[in-house]
């Protein structure tokens, strides 16, 4: 009697697992589109690093991010999420001294948050399936990197020049994010 339910249950489990699995190609496409929007918004902010030559800074991007070569798609998703989260936090800080258009900054924050929302759903599934120790060291290095950016802004009292330097760094970050999205493939 119980045998006749085993096959339908097995098929149901198989199909539901397939239906629930992460569609990395769709995610990659969505993230690339949103990254392009963020890039456009960041470029609309009026900052020119040439005007602040004394305020240059090397924030020391983690090497595995700058020269990403061996990422598993699950690790890439986790790293992308972490980068977006810190980017979002940075742009929520005091940027009043910049003269930036608040609407542009708000739109940038919306785009970044939208990417985070898209990733959160997938990350929940990824985290259930595996635990990555590789990602932990990279995440720690990323936190230190973004900490240096935050400390720089604070030390410079959120000056226009400091924000201009950070804006240029965030433009670099978007290039790194685009490179990382290449690892999100089915």
Curated annotation (Swiss-Prot):
Keywords: Antiviral defense, Cytokine, Disulfide bond, Glycoprotein, Phosphoprotein, Secreted, Signal. The keyword Acyltransferase does not apply. It comes from the Eukaryota. Pfam families: Interferon. It is found in: Secreted. One of its GO terms (cellular component) is extracellular space. The modification Phosphotyrosine is found at residue 24. One of its GO terms (molecular function) is cytokine activity. Disulfide bonds join 52-161. Transmembrane segments: none annotated. InterPro entries: 4_helix_cytokine-like_core, Interferon_alpha/beta/delta. GO terms for biological process: adaptive immune response; B cell activation involved in immune response; defense response to virus; humoral immune response; natural killer cell activation involved in immune response; negative regulation of Lewy body formation; neuron cellular homeostasis; positive regulation of autophagy. The keyword Glycoprotein applies. Glycans are attached at residues 101, 136. Residues 1-21 form the signal peptide. Monomer. Belongs to the alpha/beta interferon family. Type I interferon cytokine that plays a key role in the innate immune response to infection, developing tumors and other inflammatory stimuli. Signals via binding to high-affinity (IFNAR2) and low-affinity (IFNAR1) heterodimeric receptor, activating the canonical Jak-STAT signaling pathway resulting in transcriptional activation or repression of interferon-regulated genes that encode the effectors of the interferon response, such as antiviral proteins, regulators of cell proliferation and differentiation, and immunoregulatory proteins. This is Interferon beta. It comes from Equus caballus (Horse). The lineage of its organism: Eukaryota, Metazoa, Chordata, Craniata, Vertebrata.
């Amino acid at each position: 009697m119980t045998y006749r339910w085993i096959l339908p249950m097995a098929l149901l489990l198989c199909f539901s697992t397939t239906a629930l699995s992460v569609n990395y190609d769709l995610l990659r496409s969505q993230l690339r589109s949103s990254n392009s929007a963020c890039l456009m918004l960041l470029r609309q902010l009026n900052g020119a690093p040439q005007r602040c030559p004394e305020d240059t800074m090397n924030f020391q991007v983690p090497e595995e991010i700058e020269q990403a070569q061996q990422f598993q798609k699950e690790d890439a998703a986790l790293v992308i999420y972490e980068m977006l989260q810190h980017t979002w936090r940075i742009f929520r800080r005091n940027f009043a001294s910049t003269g930036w258009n608040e609407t542009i900054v708000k739109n940038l924050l919306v785009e970044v948050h939208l990417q985070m929302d898209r990733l959160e759903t997938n990350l929940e599934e990824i985290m259930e399936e595996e635990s990555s120790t590789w990602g932990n060291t990279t995440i720690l290095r990323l936190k230190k990197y973004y900490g240096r950016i935050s400390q720089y802004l604070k030390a410079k009292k959120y000056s226009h020049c400091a924000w201009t330097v950070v804006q240029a760094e965030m433009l670099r970050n978007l290039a790194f994010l685009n490179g990382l999205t290449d690892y999100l493939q089915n």
